[in-house]
Amino acid sequence: MPSNNPDLDLSFVYEIADGSDEFIVESIGVFLEQSPGILQEISAAIDAGDWAGAAASAHKIKANLGFFGMNLSHALITEIESACKAGGQNPAEIKAKFNQLTGIIDDAFFKLNEIKAEKEANL
């Protein structure tokens, strides 16, 4: 069941859930619980010029973005991680990409909360 969000394709999640709404609710719940903190870590590290810290935090969220079919977000976080690993040569560009990423992810969070609520109603 693909969502209306252009950067959210839950096909893989639904496939491995194999009909288990509980798995879907739990997976979405963990993502929604952990991701804001990781995004805050990235933001703080970028603001502080801590490129190694920003890259490490970006790496932590990258797999989850792929898991939820957030391909644009995954591509952006990969670019951010690479730019930070390279020493943050262009901080303004990194910040702009991060701001773009957070806007996209905020939309996905909203949609994921809706999906989670729908699935919880089935439990």
Walk through the language-model features, giving the residues of each.
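Helix-loop "lid/cap" segments that line or gate small-molecule binding pockets
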Residues: 11-18
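Short helix-adjacent coil turns
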Residues: 42, 46-54, 68, 87-89
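Conserved HATPase_c
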Residues: 25, 51, 55, 95
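An anion-binding catalytic pocket shared by soluble metabolic enzymes
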Residues: 61
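Active-site flanking loop/helix segments enriched in acidic
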Residues: 19-23
